[in-house]
Amino acid sequence: MNKGIAEILAEASKMETVEERVEHLKKNDHPSLQTVLYYCYHPSITWLLPDTNPPYKPRLKEEDIQNVLKSDFRKVRMFVEGKDYDNVKPIKREMLFIEFIESLDPDDAKLILSIKNKKMPWKNISRHVAKKAFPGLGL
């Protein structure tokens, strides 16, 4: 079964120990998973979006679209400072962001909405856990 990024993080958050959570993240490693953790926890990342969540229409949970975030995560660069998209007008950026989150699995969309405000929806997936799982991220 193809797991979405939010699903992997939710599963890890339910595990009892830090070591189990770290191992689960390593076992389900994917560039998009690492990038989610990096964009959430790295102090140099600044999102170029308002703090409030935009109005959007979430997809149906029944749709099998957990892979969309994994395959389209490169689009997130458009919403972060210093990633070659700083000159995009704010209104255009916000419109592109709405289109992006509307294309995602509803759980992955909620995850992106949280990390843009530097918050992880699962308290057990801390910066410490991310750092132990993926020390190369420089967290």
Can you say where each PLM-predicted feature lies in the sequence?
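N-terminal nucleic-acid-engaging modules of covalent nucleotidyltransferase systems
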Residues: M1-L139
